[in-house]
């Protein structure tokens, strides 16, 4: 004879769902920005008279920005808050999209030997700078969006909601390829690349608008002495007063433990295998 638990299943508060969806839009922008350049790369190579190295750089420069963004993301989010950094992620994506879409195109000069080159380095430099800034947004998003979701979500649904960020990264890549295909069919050949790059400003604007409707995380607020605000937000993020109190207590204990424990020596024999596995999974992904 089997027995069923009499404990009622707790529903997920609407604010938790909304906050997780908004944060996951950062993942969507991440994926979109990573893939969208593929549709414009061939045209850019011709317009800017790029060498093989130059062609590689217009793709790689965003990855370099991603590395830089990821390195500083944790410290920035700890100092200024998760939500402000998410805001700047939206700004970087939006500005990067519009600037690359409106980037100037150089006059091409043909030398006596038939070699074609750009008359000025400014246009490609302009394009590279804003591709780099978009990459910084990708790096920040890869760190801050999952942190925000994990700190907003109750423990019982945390894994599922953090997974939403990863899902939207892949969905953003798919959306970029689909967007490129549609634009290639409906836009003029000479301007299609601008639309491909600029269209990302649309989800970036929606991300910024929706971001205004979600709160800072209670954990960050507690860590910075804003307990009253943290408690109020926690009550909106949980189903019961008891659950909220438990989460606040757990956060306080964790913050105190982190403060007392100092820095963890990750790069030691004890953690070597786990860290190596994490790096390999991320690299091959």
PLM regions with names:
Residues 1-285:
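Transmembrane-helix signature of 12-pass secondary carriers
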